[in-house]
Design a protein with these regions (language model features):
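Alpha-helical transmembrane segments of multi-pass membrane transport proteins
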Residues: 1-210
Length: 210
């Protein structure tokens, strides 16, 4: 699509004869000459590295110790892990392919229906473009010079948390209706402290990147 649009624009300018082609090239580079735009490829790279590394497992272990003992605990862990990962990646695809895919497989093995596991995982991934850092918000801010990237980031925090809370409420209702069990008993306090320290690098990334 991008190449088709570019070729159509070049053809229109060339046939009209009103502007030299060098103006089109200059405008293309001017549109990309933006410091905030540099964050987009690095966010994508960070999300890909984190989705294939140990950070997803750290966040999963950290989230499960708080909600895994509840009825439908894997669903809650899916929501909480995805929300935490949203503060790192900013990419819905990275969330669905990384911690989302891991959680969906665990839910299926634990007796959750494949349809529900997939639906919940995809719904949680939608939070990523809302909670900062958000690639979508950066691109939107570049189109309007009166819009601040920081203001958009601040505006996305509360809606993202509300969506996560609503997904947790849906999981509560479906888990009671379908009698989904808890993931595991609540771990001892010492184990929770060790898990929290192990997840500290991932949690610090949320603060640094956000």
């Amino acid at each position: 699509i991008a190449f088709a649009l570019a070729m159509a624009a070049f053809a229109a300018v060339g046939l009209s004869g009103r502007y030299p082609l060098v103006v089109v090239v200059k405008e293309m580079f001017t549109g990309l000459d933006s410091f905030p735009l540099l964050a987009v490829p690095f966010f994508i790279l960070a999300a890909e590295i984190m989705s294939t590394g140990a950070i997803s497992r750290m966040l999963l272990r950290f989230a499960s110790q708080f909600v895994g003992h509840l009825r439908g605990g894997l669903g809650y862990a899916n929501v909480l892990t995805g929300t935490l990962f949203a503060g790192i990646s900013g990419s819905a695809l990275a969330s669905a392919a990384g911690p989302g895919a891991m959680m969906a497989r665990m839910m299926e093995r634990s007796g959750y229906s494949k349809a529900y596991a997939g639906a919940l995982t995809i719904s949680v991934a939608v939070i990523d473009p809302i909670i900062p850092p958000s690639i979508t918000m950066i691109i939107y801010a570049l189109q309007d010079r009166n819009t601040s990237v920081g203001s958009l980031f601040m505006a996305g925090i509360l809606p993202g948390i509300l969506i996560a809370a609503l997904l947790a409420a849906v999981n509560w209702w479906i888990s009671r209706k379908r009698n989904y069990r808890s993931l595991e008993p609540r771990p001892p306090v010492g184990q929770m402290v060790r898990n929290s320290f192990a997840a500290l690098p991932a949690l610090l990334l949320i603060v640094l990147i956000g």
